[in-house]
């Protein structure tokens, strides 16, 4: 089973348990704290992924590191993934959990790249248009790329909406080359 599929299954199980058990907000906050620790500690991630370190040792490590950070229910989940030899997937499980939570709440992550900085009003207008286009709440991530020459590109999941000047010039070039042939 691929790690993404397995991660999604564990994330889905935790999300379902958290919703049914009434500790969704708590689990979400605790997973966010775990993610911060994992992002800051490469060594911990390597230990969790190491095939040399046994499941009992990983369980003990997770308990030591996160005892003050997480509650009993999330700790049970951490122990479970360690026992099932899936602790190395913890960073991906957290990512998948957030994706599933966003999906359930009608939130979509969108990457907006522009050639020049956009004003707050421009960003708000674009986000409003994207929200009406997708029918979901938009969580935007802004980036700058001078190679676009002008305009913006928007990435929504696997879909890219390219309104950049660079793209328009590439299309024009293709049209001119195909006319010449």
Swiss-Prot record:
It is found in: Cell inner membrane. NCBIfam families: ATP_synt_delta. PANTHER family: ATP SYNTHASE DELTA CHAIN. One of its GO terms (cellular component) is plasma membrane. Pfam families: OSCP. F(1)F(0) ATP synthase produces ATP from ADP in the presence of a proton or sodium gradient. F-type ATPases consist of two structural domains, F(1) containing the extramembraneous catalytic core and F(0) containing the membrane proton channel, linked together by a central stalk and a peripheral stalk. During catalysis, ATP synthesis in the catalytic domain of F(1) is coupled via a rotary mechanism of the central stalk subunits to proton translocation. Keywords: ATP synthesis, Cell inner membrane, Cell membrane, CF(1), Hydrogen ion transport, Ion transport, Membrane, Transport. This is ATP synthase subunit delta. It comes from Chlorobium phaeobacteroides (strain DSM 266 / SMG 266 / 2430). Its main location: membrane. InterPro entries: ATP_synth_OSCP/delta_N_sf, ATPase_OSCP/dsu. One of its GO terms (molecular function) is proton-transporting ATP synthase activity, rotational mechanism. F-type ATPases have 2 components, F(1) - the catalytic core - and F(0) - the membrane proton channel. F(1) has five subunits: alpha(3), beta(3), gamma(1), delta(1), epsilon(1). F(0) has three main subunits: a(1), b(2) and c(10-14). The alpha and beta chains form an alternating ring which encloses part of the gamma chain. F(1) is attached to F(0) by a central stalk formed by the gamma and epsilon chains, while a peripheral stalk is formed by the delta and b chains. Belongs to the ATPase delta chain family. It is a peripheral membrane protein. The keyword Transport applies.
């Amino acid at each position: 089973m691929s790690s993404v599929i397995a991660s999604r299954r564990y994330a889905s199980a935790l999300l379902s348990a958290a919703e049914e058990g009434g500790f969704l907000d708590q689990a979400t906050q605790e997973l966010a704290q775990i993610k911060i620790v994992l992002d800051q500690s490469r060594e911990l991630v390597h230990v969790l992924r190491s095939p040399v370190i046994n499941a009992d040792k990983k369980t003990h490590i997770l308990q030591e590191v996160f005892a003050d950070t997480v509650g009993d229910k999330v700790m049970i989940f951490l122990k479970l993934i360690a026992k099932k030899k899936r602790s190395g997937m913890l960073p991906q499980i957290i990512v998948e959990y957030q994706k599933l939570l966003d999906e359930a709440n009608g939130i979509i992550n969108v990457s907006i790249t522009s050639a020049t900085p956009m004003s707050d009003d421009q960003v708000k207008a674009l986000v409003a248009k994207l929200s009406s286009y997708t029918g979901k709440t938009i969580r935007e991530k802004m980036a700058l790329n001078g190679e676009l020459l002008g305009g913006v590109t928007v990435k929504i999941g696997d879909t890219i909406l390219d309104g950049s000047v660079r793209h328009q010039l590439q299309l024009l070039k293709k049209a001119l080359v195909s006319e010449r042939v």
